[in-house]
Swiss-Prot record:
GO terms for cellular component: cytosol. Keywords: 4Fe-4S, Cytoplasm, Iron, Iron-sulfur, Metal-binding, S-adenosyl-L-methionine, Transferase, tRNA processing. The lineage of its organism: Bacteria, Bacillati, Bacillota, Bacilli, Bacillales. This is tRNA-2-methylthio-N(6)-dimethylallyladenosine synthase. Residues 207-437 form the Radical SAM core domain. Catalyzes the methylthiolation of N6-(dimethylallyl)adenosine (i(6)A), leading to the formation of 2-methylthio-N6-(dimethylallyl)adenosine (ms(2)i(6)A) at position 37 in tRNAs that read codons beginning with uridine. It is found in: Cytoplasm. The keyword Transferase applies. Monomer.
Length: 509
């Protein structure tokens, strides 16, 4: 234990019970709860790009001899944020651990998209309380999207006083300072920025594996769908400069990565916030496809921003894969209007027709919400009919979950839960039917598979994914992990494929 840690331990043990504190004043000055009116007024002039992340000398060996544990909930953006926080911890001298019992710092990187996700976090905080009682020096933190909600932070203050720090999505780069404050503070350290932070380049990362990598290309969302909390928790759209993205992808390719996924809450709005150049996702993809890396994906896209130039570029193929995740949410134009999706059923179908014409072998997947306020049986049937017409390969399906502060949360939630569950069951039956039918076509085909590693269910079986994001299980030597191989599909299941290795690793050119 170093001197800073020893002093922190003395202070923590001197008063294990945290002083009660009024946080309402804090929120009046720093945090504003979700406001559609205020959020739509936000400009882009405050966002700056910082390219030199560095740590002052005071943080050298700050975490030496200590371990960190991060549990991640939610989307790929949260997964990537966890990689950044792990990179910062490592730079501070901390070591990772895979058990909470062995950790000196525990962070829960949270998701606010649905109530169920929040309930899981509060449940986990309850489970961590005995650890804190056993070891008062343990630091417990809550970060991510839930932390951007005032009601959530107030609940943590009132019911989970063993939490040492709370910070949001805009100030991850300040983790060293937050850790230091938490180590020396008797009260919970709360640092939540209601306004977006700068775009910080060159943040350290500890990537999960060396085969696939996430690459953030933009942050935030300006679409303001009535049900969605993301524009409030993640802020306005801010795009990274193309030269920084291209540099990062080239670096990943040089280090042997085979696949990258470009990330953004609304990834195909990339570049719309630039005021000094006309440059969009299609232009970026056209540059990236020239880099020597096997596969490039992106997620998640909004139909409203899926333009013809992007479709044209994706049609060039090469390392641009034939899989597009295109959330529709509902097949009813009336429902889409209430959701503020800003497109109609026919406009979505026309977009699908354009994509299929340019990329005939494309695989489309989607997101769908059932039980949105005022959804009628007829409108739900329109969703089922759209699914059949598009012939999606799979879908993420959800029962509507009200999010405090969003316009939809003020609507009367007038669909009985039993009706919501019945609709979800019917939709999932259709999803399963089409997934099984689509996968059946792969039987007898030879496909390219990027091998991720051992199957989760059987260590003697390897698992990987096709260009169209199909899970393939097959028997092969462990030496092919991380490689591209040819596999003949012998059996199709609803959500996966079984096959046989027919060729040694493919050389990527």
């Amino acid at each position: 234990m170093n001197e800073q840690q020893r002093l922190a331990s003395q202070q923590a043990n001197a008063s294990t019970k945290k002083e009660e504190k009024d946080y309402s004043k804090y929120f009046e000055h720093v945090y504003q709860p979700p406001s559609l009116k205020d959020a739509k007024k936000r400009g882009k002039e405050q966002v700056k790009i910082e390219r030199d992340f560095g740590l002052p000398e005071e943080f050298r060996n700050f975490g030496k001899g200590r371990k960190f544990y991060i549990r991640t909930y939610g989307c790929q953006m949260n997964e990537h944020d966890t990689e950044v926080m792990a990179g910062i911890f490592t730079t501070l001298g901390y070591e990772p651990t895979f058990t909470t019992e062995d950790a000196d710092v525990i962070l829960l990187n949270t998701c606010a998209i649905r109530e169920n996700a929040e309930n899981k976090v509060f449940g986990e905080l309850g489970h961590l309380k005995p650890l804190k009682q056993k070891n008062p020096d343990l630091l417990i933190g809550v970060c991510g999207c839930m932390s951007q909600e005032e009601s959530v932070v107030n609940k943590i203050m009132q019911k989970h006083q063993h939490v040492d720090m709370v910070f949001g999505t805009h100030n991850i780069h300040r983790l060293p300072y937050i850790l230091k404050d938490a180590m020396f503070s008797k009260a919970t350290v709360v640092e939540v920025w209601s306004k977006e932070g700068d775009v910080i380049e060159n943040l350290p990362k500890v990537r999960r594996g060396d085969i696939k990598a996430w690459v953030n290309i933009m942050y935030g969302c300006d679409k303001f769908c009535t049900y969605c909390i993301v524009p409030y928790t993640r802020g306005k759209e801010r795009s990274r400069r193309p030269e920084d993205i291209i540099k990062e992808v080239r670096h990943l390719a040089a280090n042997g990565y085979k696949e990258i996924t470009l990330l953004g809450q609304n990834v195909n709005a990339y570049g719309k916030d630039f005021d000094d150049l006309e440059y969009g996702l299609g232009d970026l993809m056209d540059e990236l496809r020239k880099i020597d890396i096997a596969r490039i994906r992106f997620t998640t896209s909004h139909p409203r921003d899926f333009d013809d130039h992007l479709i044209e570029v994706l049609g060039k193929g090469g390392n641009l894969v034939e899989h597009i995740h295109l959330p529709v949410q509902s097949g009813s134009t009336d429902m889409l209007k209430i959701m503020a999706r800003k497109y109609t059923r026919e406009q979505y179908l026309e977009l699908v027709r354009k994509i299929k014409k340019t990329i005939p072998n494309v695989v489309l997947t989607t997101d769908i919400i059932v039980g949105f306020p005022n959804e009628t049986d007829e409108q739900f049937e329109e969703t089922l009919s759209l699914y059949r017409e598009v012939e999606f390969d799979s879908a993420f399906t959800f029962i509507y979950s009200p999010r405090e502060g969003t316009p939809a949360a003020k609507m009367k939630d007038n669909i009985p839960m039993e009706v919501k569950k019945e609709r979800l069951q019917r939709l999932n039956e259709l999803v399963n039917e089409f997934s099984a039918k689509k996968n059946k076509k792969y039987e007898g085909q030879i496909v390219e598979v990027l091998v991720d590693g051992e199957s989760k269910n059987n260590p003697d079986v390897l698992a990987g994914y096709t260009r169209t994001n199909k899970l393939v299980n097959f028997v092969a030597p462990k030496s092919v992990i991380g490689q591209l191989v040819k596999v003949k599909i012998t059996e199709a299941k609803t959500w996966s494929l079984n096959g046989e290795l027919v060729e040694e690793p493919i050389e990527v050119k």
